[in-house]
Swiss-Prot record:
The keyword Transcription does not apply. CDD domains: YlxS_C (cd01734). It is found in: Cytoplasm. Its main location: cytoplasm. Keywords: Cytoplasm, Ribosome biogenesis. This is Ribosome maturation factor RimP. GO terms for biological process: ribosomal small subunit assembly; translation. Belongs to the RimP family.
């Protein structure tokens, strides 16, 4: 069975791309009565507030018709930002050599939180250099992953 996020991504990909943007990813966070649906978009020239507002209107219209979420939620549309979340193998592969932090469902090397440089991505497996040690993590074990911004 597909996750809610994957069903939403499938539903929203075409309308977002029709506006000229890439659907970077989706997060749905249930927090009691105040759930949040975050839709991340990206574009060749970046994203501005007007892009987010236009995309929000389009996404909201699709969600109103399809009604995939039965509870109340707040819709947020934004750029992934400098500490962008990573959702797919392709996104992780694009950041080989960069530092990331990942939160895991099941511990690897005794930890559910890892920080390290991506050394490679093969299929659905991510290799990280964590404090000089090579660790391999299945992408489906990653609850959340983000690029660590360098300033």
């Amino acid at each position: 069975m597909a996750t809610l996020e994957s069903r939403l991504a499938e539903m929203l990909k075409v309308p977002v791309e029709a506006l000229g943007f890439q659907l970077w990813g989706i997060e749905y966070v249930q927090a009691g009565k105040h759930s949040i649906l975050r839709v991340f978009i990206d574009g060749e020239n970046g994203i501005n507030i007007e892009d987010c507002a236009n995309t929000s209107r389009q996404v909201s219209a699709v969600l109103d018709v399809e009604d995939p979420i039965s509870t109340e939620y707040t819709l947020e549309v934004s750029s992934p930002g400098v500490d962008r979340p990573l959702f797919t193998a392709e996104q992780y592969a694009a950041y080989v050599g960069e530092d990331v932090k990942v939160q895991l469902t099941m511990p690897v090397a005794g930890s559910r939180n890892l920080k390290g440089a991506i050394t490679k991505v093969e299929g659905q497996m991510l290799s990280l250099n964590v404090n000089g040690k090579e660790l391999v993590v299945a992408l489906d074990n990653i609850r959340k992953g983000n690029v660590i911004a360098k300033f």
